[in-house]
Amino acid sequence: FRGRVLGVAVKSFLPNYREFYELRHFRPASALPSDTLDLLGQKDIPVGADLIFEAEGIPGFRLFCEICEDLWTPVPPSCYAALSGATVAVNLSASNVSTGKADYRRALVANQSARCIAAYVYAGAGAGESTTDLAWDGHALVAENGEILAESERFSRKPAVTLADIDLGRLAGDRTTITTFSDAGGRTERPPFRRISFPLGAPSGIIPLARTVPRFPYVPSD
């Protein structure tokens, strides 16, 4: 962030089935020997799967990062992060292409955002990273509380950015209204999280919305 490493998010669950053999080379977050590291001339950088990045100047923006397979597990780490206050979960992924997987991935992202009453931002490896063994499609998704707000074109060979407006106020309101969310937070045993503040600040001036407000917001579209 602006020339400084705020923290290093580590993968919690490593797949070791079918075409995946990550445990041959890597270890999960639970095997970390320390909760800090020295990197790029910086000392004592927080490292782990327990980091929530909190933006100063933008109320309600608390970001958690998980990696690829973490989303495919029965209880993704982002569930615990959401119960600990995270409102936006991001997933840096290298989920390869197979028949029907895009629909399954889309459903996973939408459902996880609904379960956590959060935004979920998913960014997959691009087609240019494909090899003779596996192929990737550059699938990117932005979901908010069960709704897909934006989705990338798959298999694009051109650089692209997938953007969406996320309503943090709505998420806060929904979490307050849905009492079972706070009930789950009180009943669920979850690991402690470290919060890392950074001075993002809200942009100045008027910024056009990329998200339209429906004329009849209380009438279902279907």
Question: What is the role of each PLM region?
Answer:
Residues 1-222:
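Enzyme catalytic cores with a strong preference for nitrogen-chemistry domains
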